[in-house]
Amino acid sequence: MFEEHYRYLESIQNRRDYIEDQIQTGSPVIGLVYDDGVLILTLTSSQKLYEVHNHLALSAIGHTADIERLRLLVTDSASVQGFQSSIDDVTLHRLTNFVLCPPIKQSFESVFNPPTVAKILLAELGRLNRPHQLVTVNYDGTTSIQKHIAVIGGSEDIEELMRDYIDQTDAGLSDKLTLQDAFELAIQTWAVGRLANQRSNPEIQLGAEVAGYDVERLNQCLQTELIELYVEAGTLQTSKRGKSKFRSLTDQEIASFLPFEISGDER
């Protein structure tokens, strides 16, 4: 009996190691509350940001097939719930705890079946005097709820470093940021996460002091990455008219918000 329990724990740890190895190089995703809603930003080579429902949005890192399966699951569930009852019943809490987490947790603990290789970030625009909310769902089904900032990255160390970078600015804890301020902070935080993952560089180590990530260094990282990737950013916007509060930032907006000009080689 003891031996079987040990083997199960060993299998769980092996699954954890496998998943973390698979998502280690994933492009970070940052969610920030600003003065007119919530911004979600990442750099990518293909779409990673989706509207879930009128006031809900999702992004993720991991295996594309797993992300798409979970996206469809939560989007379909939100649509059915909104149709059968009320849009007020379509909440981040309900979708996270009763739709997303159970199958993710089950697949992680079922050691004879493939695990779900994905980390998810969801955002909810506050309504009916409820505050904006950000939630991250880990590959094992555990969640973290935040009111101002949320990040997902290739490892917990990278995520901690990105949060530390935002915390040192004090801006990440305020809902008074303009959209441009939030964009600049989010994209610089993305660069911090990207640099932290470059273990081949002896100057960059996980857990390094965030003070070492000066703006010039971050901008150089972004300019290099934008040769192969593009910025994908979207907002859940309080002032937007209509039922849907989600919108993607235009190429013109992104270009105007970047702290440098994009050359012809950059996307």
PLM regions: where:
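Long, low-complexity N-terminal extensions
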Residues: 1-267
